[in-house]
From Swiss-Prot:
Organism classification: Archaea, Methanobacteriati, Methanobacteriota, Thermococci, Thermococcales
Protein name: Polyamine aminopropyltransferase
Gene Ontology molecular function terms on file: spermidine synthase activity
Keyword set includes Amino-acid biosynthesis: no
Gene3D superfamilies according to UniProt: Spermidine synthase, tetramerisation domain (2.30.140.10), Vaccinia Virus protein VP39 (3.40.50.150)
Gene: speE
Pfam families, per database record: Spermine_synt_N (PF17284), Spermine_synth (PF01564)
Intracellular or extracellular location(s): Cytoplasm
PROSITE patterns: PABS_1, PABS_2
Length: 280
C-alpha cells in the first residue's frame, strides 16, 4: 500500500494496482490480515494478506464463471458444497438455481464472513441469515474444509472458492484432497476450483491438473478474464460419472440474469494459450 494506491505483487514482478480513496478497515483475524478499501473506480476492495479477493464493481467476472458452468452442466444440482467463499459471492450465484435444496458453506475464518456481510455487501443479505442460522437453504459451518470433506459426502456439486494455490490453501490442491472430494460427490457429480493465474501460476496450475487426472473420471480446464486479478484466471473441473462438461443447459442459463459468463458461448471458456495446452 502506497499513498492512495493498493498494489498486489505477483511472481516475476507483475503487479495489479488500484487507486483508493481511503482504507475502510484493517483487522487481523486468527488466520490472516483482512483489509477493505474504497477504490476510485471499482467500488470496495477486499484484500486478504495483501492479495485482492474482489472488487465489488467487477466481482461477478469471477463468481459467475466459477459457479455457473458447473451448475448448468449438472443435470440436477440439488445439494451443493462450497469450501471457502466467505465473501458471499459464490453462494449468491448458487442460489440463483431454483433446483438447489441445500448449500453448505465451510469457511475457516468467521471474520471474513462478518466483515464481508457488513462492509462488502455483495451477498444480498445471505451471509447475515446464515450467521444467525435463519437461511432456508444455506447452512454455514465455521471450520476446516479439508477436514469437513474427509467426513462428509452426498454432494452433487463441490465448489472450492479458496485463496491462491500457494501457501495456506496448498492442501486444497493436494491429491489426497481430490480423492476425498471425489468420494464426497454423488454420481454424477462435478468438482470445480479456481486455479490461479494462467501465466503467473503456470506450474501450480499444471500440477493441480495432473493430480486431478489421477483421481477424477474426466478433468477439464478453462479460463476467464477477471477484473482485479492477473488474468486470464484458470479454473479446473473434475467430473464423477458421465457428465459432459463441454455441454451446459444454455436455456436455463439465459434465465439467470448473468452479466459476464454467457452459456450460449460456453465453448469459448476452453481457449488456453497454446504453450499451456502443449504442457498438459
Amino acid at each position: 500500500m502506497r499513498d492512495m494506491e493498493f498494489i498486489e505483487w505477483y511472481p516475476r514482478g507483475y503487479g495489479v494496482a488500484f487507486k483508493v480513496k481511503r482504507k475502510i478497515l484493517e483487522e487481523q483475524s486468527e488466520y490472516q490480515k483482512i483489509e477493505v478499501y474504497e477504490t476510485e473506480g471499482f467500488g470496495k476492495l477486499l484484500a486478504i494478506d495483501g492479495t485482492v479477493q474482489l472488487v465489488t464493481e467487477g466481482e461477478k467476472s469471477y463468481h459467475e464463471p466459477l459457479v455457473h458452468p458447473a451448475m448448468l452442466a449438472h443435470p440436477n444440482p440439488r445439494r451443493v458444497l462450497i469450501i471457502g467463499g466467505g465473501d458471499g459471492g459464490a453462494i449468491r450465484e448458487v442460489l440463483k438455481h431454483e433446483e438447489v435444496e441445500e448449500v453448505i458453506m465451510v469457511e475457516i475464518d468467521k471474520k471474513v464472513i462478518e466483515i464481508s456481510a457488513k462492509y462488502i455487501g455483495i451477498d444480498g443479505g445471505i451471509l447475515e441469515k446464515m450467521l444467525s442460522d435463519k437461511h432456508e437453504k444455506g447452512k454455514l459451518i465455521i471450520g476446516d474444509g479439508v477436514k469437513f470433506i474427509e467426513e462428509n459426502s452426498g454432494f452433487d456439486v463441490i465448489i472450492v472458492d479458496s485463496t491462491d494455490p500457494v501457501g495456506p490453501a496448498e492442501m486444497l490442491f493436494s491429491e489426497e484432497f481430490y480423492k476425498n472430494a471425489y468420494r464426497a460427490l454423488n454420481d454424477p457429480g462435478i468438482y470445480v476450483t479456481q486455479a490461479g493465474s494462467v501465466y503467473l501460476f503456470t506450474d501450480e496450475f499444471l500440477t493441480a491438473y495432473r493430480k486431478m487426472r489421477k483421481v477424477f473420471d474426466k478433468v477439464y480446464y478453462y479460463s476467464f478474464p477477471v477484473i482485479g486479478y492477473a488474468s486470464p484466471w484458470a479454473f479446473l473441473v473434475g467430473v464423477k460419472g458421465s457428465i459432459d462438461f463441454m455441454k451446459v443447459d444454455a436455456e436455463k442459463g439465459k434465465k439467470l440474469g448473468l452479466e459476464y459468463y454467457d452459456p450460449d458461448k460456453h465453448e469459448t471458456l476452453f481457449q488456453m494459450p497454446r504453450y499451456i495446452v502443449q504442457m498438459l
